[in-house]
Amino acid sequence: MKTLRLHCGAICALAIFATGCAQLKAPPYAADYEALDRLHASKPGTVAVATTQPTDPTQAVNKLSLRGAALLSPSGSFAKYFEDALIRDLKEVSSFDSSAATRLDSRILKNEISVGGFVTGTGVMEVELTVTRNAQQRLHKIYQVNTTFDSSFAGIVAIPAGQAAYPDLVRTMLRAIYSDPLFIAAVGK
C-alpha cells in the first residue's frame, strides 16, 4: 500500500512538473476582415514595414509565460509575430510595398497574457508606432489595448485559453491602429 501511494505521488509530481515546464506555441494570426475593409476604404497609400523591435528574444516582451509554461512565437519572437501580422494585413489591402516612401516603425513596449484570474484571463499590449514619409515624421504614437477572455482557476483550462487568446490580442492592437484617424491620415495617399 505504501509503495502504491509512493508511485501515485511520484506520477502526480511528474505530471505537475511536466505541464509547468511545457512549451506552447501561439496560434497563427488571423486578420480582422472588418477592420481591413475599413482600412481599405480609407484608400491608404503603399507602406513599407521596418523590423519590429525589440528583436532580441530574451527581451521581456518576447518571453511570455502561462503559469510557468512558456508561450513561444511561431515566428521566433513576438516582435516578429506582430511584424508578420502587420505585413500580412497590409498585403491583404494591397498597401504593402517594401520600397515605399511611407514607412512604419514599431516597437512593442508591453506584451502580456495573464491566466492568473479565477474565471477571466487578460491581455495587455502596448506598441510605439512611427510613420515617416520621405524621412519626415507623420505620426508618432503609443497605442495600448487590453483584452479579456474566459479562463479558469484550473491550469488545464487556463493555459490553453491563454495560448488561444494571443492572436486576438494582436488583432485587437492592429484594429485599434487601423481605426485611428491619425494613422489613416499618416498612411494616406
Language-model-derived ranges and their functions:
Residues 87, 91-95, 113, 174-182:
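Sec-exported extracytoplasmic/periplasmic mature domains
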Residues 79, 83, 87-90, 167-174:
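Extracytoplasmic/secreted envelope proteins and their assembly/folding machinery
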Residues 21-80, 84, 182-189:
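A structural "domain/chain start" motif
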Residues 22-34, 92-140, 144-160:
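Surface-exposed short loop/turn segments
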Residues 54-56, 125-130, 165-169:
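Short alpha-helical linear motifs
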Residues 60-75, 136-179:
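Short secondary-structure boundary motifs at beta->alpha junctions and helix caps
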